[in-house]
Amino acid sequence: MSNVSFRQDHDFEKRKAEALRIREKYSDRVPVIVEKSEKSDIPNIDKKKYLVPADLTVGQFVYVIRKRIQLSAEKAIFIFVDNVLPPTGAMMSTIYDENKEEDGFLYVTYSGENTFGSSMT
């Protein structure tokens, strides 16, 4: 899998048009880009783009990521939005509304260690 980020691989206008199309077609879902932290030695994820149900919690989404990278139960995984650990009980729709980028995607970074250390309140 390429280490090129989604932003580098797709220009802004294409990303924005795609996110808009997704939101119009699937109003009950949010477009999320998931990328591994550069510093982490955790496994790579098999795909970066996800269409996440709006009512999914952050904790449930972490479970999805854990399954996609086939991470064993004893290994830790953390996800970050703008270098901040979101609350596990928060709805993905809320995190999306508060943190989506100008292109319409929510960017999530995952790591095997708590590299940033702070959490959203």
From Swiss-Prot:
The keyword Lipoprotein applies. Keywords: Autophagy, Cytoplasm, Cytoplasmic vesicle, Cytoskeleton, Lipoprotein, Membrane, Microtubule, Protein transport, Transport, Ubl conjugation pathway, Vacuole. One of its GO terms (biological process) is autophagy. The C-terminal 4 residues are removed by ATG4 to expose Gly-117 at the C-terminus. This Gly-117 forms then a thioester bond with the 'Cys-558' of ATG7 (E1-like activating enzyme) before being transferred to the 'Cys-258' of ATG3 (the specific E2 conjugating enzyme), in order to be finally amidated with phosphatidylethanolamine. This lipid modification anchors ATG8 to autophagosomes. The record marks G117, S118 as: Cleavage. A lipid is attached at G117 (Phosphatidylethanolamine amidated glycine). It is found in: Cytoplasmic vesicle, Autophagosome membrane; Vacuole membrane; Cytoplasm, Cytoskeleton. It comes from the Eukaryota. It is a lipid-anchor. Its main location: membrane. Residues 118-121 form a propeptide. GO terms for cellular component: autophagosome; autophagosome membrane; cytoplasmic vesicle; microtubule. Constitutively expressed. Ubiquitin-like modifier involved in autophagosomes formation. May mediate the delivery of the autophagosomes to the vacuole via the microtubule cytoskeleton. Interacts with ATG4. Belongs to the ATG8 family. This is Autophagy-related protein 8g. It comes from Arabidopsis thaliana (Mouse-ear cress). The gene is ATG8G.
